[in-house]
């Protein structure tokens, strides 16, 4: 059996790089570690970290196709982020103009969670730990 060590990063393609960079950095609190414009591909690439750990590779490409359907299309369904206080996290998102679904309780763990979306409609989850 393959012995994976960890998830290294998640790649996200944005339709508007600057808008998504602002969302992930200014709203969600990621840090931009490195950024490069790749002229041959007309594409930005930004490396984002959370709490010092490289997590998201943010890309832009000219005219990317829209996401198929939300959320039950094949492939990646959503990204989930752990938070200590879901009410505070939801309030922070709403203050930044981000709509959240009502907070629910996971029937298996009894933990609270909610969903919201990035600027391109990628489903994101907050999960209280």
Could you say what each language-model-derived stretch is?
Residues 58, 69-73:
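Helix-adjacent hinge/juxtasegments
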Residues 1-18, 76-81:
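N-terminal beta-strand motif that seeds the catalytic metal site of vicinal oxygen chelate
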Residues 6, 42-44, 75, 110:
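Exposed loop/turn and edge beta-strand positions of beta-sandwich/beta-sheet ligand-binding modules
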Residues 12-55, 95:
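Core segments of cupin and vicinal oxygen chelate
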Residues 33-35, 41-44, 63-69, 102:
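A short, acidic/glycine-rich surface segment
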Residues 2-3, 36, 47, 90-129:
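Vicinal oxygen chelate
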Residues 72, 79-86:
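Mid-chain, well-packed structural core segment of small domains
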